[in-house]
Regions:
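Conserved nucleotide-sugar donor-binding catalytic segment
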Residues: 6, 68-160, 164
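Glycine-rich, basic loop-to-helix element that forms the pyrophosphate-binding segment
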Residues: 1-8, 21
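Catalytic core of nucleotide-sugar-dependent glycosyltransferases
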Residues: 67, 139-147, 152-180, 203, ...
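Short aromatic/hydrophobic "clamp" motif used to bind/position activated sugar donors
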Residues: 13
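The conserved acidic donor/metal-binding loop of glycosyltransferases
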Residues: 18-21, 46
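Conserved donor NDP-sugar-binding/catalytic core segment of glycosyltransferases
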Residues: 25-65
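Short, high-confidence coil segments that cap the C-terminus of an alpha-helix
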Residues: 10, 37-40, 131
Length: 222
């Protein structure tokens, strides 16, 4: 992702995954959204999720993301502590589908030391600097989810959760300094992240992945 940012030349930026698909209306949607919502720095369109074969995907992850998405499925801009709380409660964003104002993503950049939660970290940084995120349910992107992804492997191994825990505790500290008590509390508890780890424990145990069981169990109670 950092290398991609070195090629930015235009005021709007999109960094998609290798096998994700922009729908034909994506660019037009983005340009119009940026014009209509000058207070937004990040743009999240509606997303259809597909598996490695191109079929619709309805995994537990999708159901959880749908639960945490804004309940009002109309275009809206989230900002400040409200944006931080929304994302920290449960990461409902589809990172490869996001678009950004170049001045924002280049000005803030990705935090060092994160490989899995870099999207949440950047969105939280935007929120803490006063930027807004437009959520528009207009479908414009196909996001591909398959079991062989880097984040899926890290999840079963439990290694991603050490990074998540470190991130949430860092956010709790930083948001506490801003006086964002609710956001700090949500980050400190990181309930959805713990539940995610707990849901993977049976799979890790069945696979006799004892390291994964240990890592996942630690995150559930930490």
């Amino acid at each position: 992702y950092r290398k991609c940012l070195t090629f930015v030349e235009n005021p709007l930026v999109q960094v998609m995954g290798a096998d994700d698909i922009m729908l034909p209306n994506y660019v037009d949607w983005l340009v119009r959204a940026a014009e209509r919502h000058p207070d937004a720095a990040i743009f999240q369109p509606g997303v259809f999720v597909i598996d490695e074969h191109g079929a619709p995907s309805h995994t537990l992850v999708e159901r959880v993301k749908s639960f945490y998405m804004p309940s009002r499925r109309v275009p809206q801009v989230l900002r400040g502590e409200a944006l931080a709380v929304s994302i920290l409660r449960g990461d409902w964003l589809y990172f490869p589908s996001l678009a950004w104002r170049a001045e924002t993503i280049l000005g803030i950049g990705f935090r060092e030391g994160y490989d899995v939660v870099q999207d949440m970290a950047l969105v939280c940084d935007v929120a803490m600097q006063g930027g807004g995120l437009l959520y528009d349910p207009t479908a414009a992107f196909l996001y591909r989810r398959h079991s062989g992804s880097d984040s899926s492997w890290r999840a079963l191994e439990g290694t991603r959760f050490g990074e998540e825990r470190r991130f949430f505790l860092q956010m709790a500290t930083e948001m506490g300094r801003l006086g964002w008590k609710r956001a700090a509390r949500v980050a400190r508890l990181h309930i959805s992240s713990r539940l995610h780890a707990g849901s993977l424990l049976p799979r890790a145990a069945l696979a006799r992945n004892m390291a994964g069981v240990k890592n996942l169990g630690r995150h559930v109670v930490a």
